[in-house]
């Protein structure tokens, strides 16, 4: 094996000498080197750079000066002594870490010798095995860690804790296998489960090393995924979580789970939104197969930068600290985003020394077959199985997570910096500041453990409500036990629940392959022949989807939806909605108000009343708290819903609310409460909205303040050809600013923004800044339809404000013609129906153009109508393309079902303006 190379190798060697590390401990040399660099690396980088800047290093090149540092400071022990003197905390960390690890290694050597015969008997090792090397796996907890041991013949795993969980799990799998055999459904497989060999020594244990192995046939691939389904059902039943890609290994046709710490998982503090409907949704997410971690759906509080699931995952981005300028005197650490790919959990063929992986999406039916078979056996034998669990699970220890371990890691990385090493109390005090409602005893124990550079660890017995730390001290008394939490769910297992979980399994695996496609086969959109009847039926179906899928809190009259979304890392997630217009309940409210005006009915009125009550209450309760004020994502948009609701239902006007929101605005305050400048979340969207109110002149001063703030924010060197996020939208805000204030400064900025956007002009269209191939888009958010809104609005405002010269007006009309041509030829064929980046948004804009700028063009009018009919026919027969499956939807106005409803109703009602896409709420 090639020897691993390290920076500052002479410092490492000197440290071995300083701590008198013996030669026979070379078997853990790499681990010790990693520990030393992990503790001292930042200090060494700081030290060599300081000496470089002080001209204390000899040599003509950075490499020569690095070698001088190694010879003069590292080899001689000067660097070691300097760390000891300047950073005593780091020295203590180093001493404790090395001593703890060497103590652990020594104990493992003794235990291996003592347990040798039993290890051979259990076939965990072969006869005549001797230890060659050891390697830490995972996190250190109080100086202890899981260790991968390599012998002269094979490998095995040492765990510094009882293996009672592993023993119980193996026994449960054996017990379940007896039911499969009795049912006669698994006799041809002989054994449904691969049981990992273990040797539990009560305070520590030995585990067989499970390595990935190839499969030999497609039948074995099907067997693997069938068994994945079986294990998924078992994990769901036992509240076994954290089954991400690192904890599942593909050993031929056998999936092996190698970490069982989170069995009988018990959520410590379910987030209380003080809102029953959101709590119901949150509980539904946590109490589903999603919580196992095996499915590619983002779980609550997950901080992975991608998909970590145990079935499909292993591809994600993460931030890593890497060495820049290695072996030079200007060496430094830099954080970079690394895209990592892991496939040990995916079955594969060996094909001419190349691995050919069997993707889960091709074996969904096998996964579901295994899940359903196991689930039905559990339901059929519920009391027998419960009796076994009560008897055999008493030895299970459940790991308790008060926080995501990534939060601890962030604090630990900061604490290791020489800059903060003497300020650790302040760093770790953040655990108290951001206490999440945790008690003092918990936080005290967290700080005590993290002070040893360990990830805090807590556990409790399955039948106990006492949460303990690593020292066995009780630090919290829960109201429930892990077994009672399990029992609550176990009692609810039934065929209906199984069918719901199966839908989640199928949806999550298939939809991760093709995001934002809806319908059983995720087919691409193709134009259909539809009718006016399709349009009316579609409106009723979409309104029913919204109303039937609302979650209502009966105790507090709250309402919400469990909506599908996409996280920043491109992972699917379920989420309850905020109050905003863009994808929240205010936006759904606007769509349902349009529907209610079209078809007044008691049920829609009831839903709208609940939405209004929610938004009004939150306005009152949170008006003084820091939050977003933008139109689409903040208070101004929520206000627009309240105003529209009061108009429809003839309630007392809330018009004073807008004045109250804006009264304290200053250009300085806008910099913090409006972090963006664009139409979506910044001043631009608010200016356009207010300027389209009938009484906009009453807000002249407020508009001027927003314009001043926007003027200070914008970057007149950046060209983003976009209405929602870029030049077109911001330029439109300044057009309205000029209309209201007649200030020539705003007109000048408009021209600069327009010219800047045209620097992104292609032969056809404008560059979509998100794309690397310099192509254009047809969407509202980043493309032609949004830019078309801007040009039409400029022409409309120019009729009274006269800010365009004749040549400029001709130019705007020419640009508008090109943008409309893009919409007609390309904007009707995108594989999404939503307002923001789909066909309904494009149709709404194209229809507004035809009615106001080309109203004699009957052919265009008919073409638009046929496209509306086509979308409706397709949606009714093949699925509404805006979510990720026919059972689960994105409900938001700009990205989901409610936006499709909004667009269709406005067509039927013949509303010939841009509506919320302006934004304008009529």
From Swiss-Prot:
CDD domains referenced in this protein's UniProt entry, alphabetically: LanM-like
Record field: transmembrane: none
The keyword Secreted is assigned to this record: no
Matching InterPro entries: LANC-like, Lant_dehyd, Lanti_2_LanM
One GO BP: bacteriocin biosynthetic process
Pfam families, per the entry: DUF4135 (PF13575), LANC_like (PF05147)
Entry keyword set: Antibiotic biosynthesis, Bacteriocin biosynthesis
Record-linked NCBIfam families: lanti_2_LanM
Function: Could be implicated in the processing or the export process of the lantibiotic lacticin 481/lactococcin DR.
Annotated protein name in UniProt: Lacticin 481/lactococcin biosynthesis protein LcnDR2
This protein's encoding gene: lcnDR2
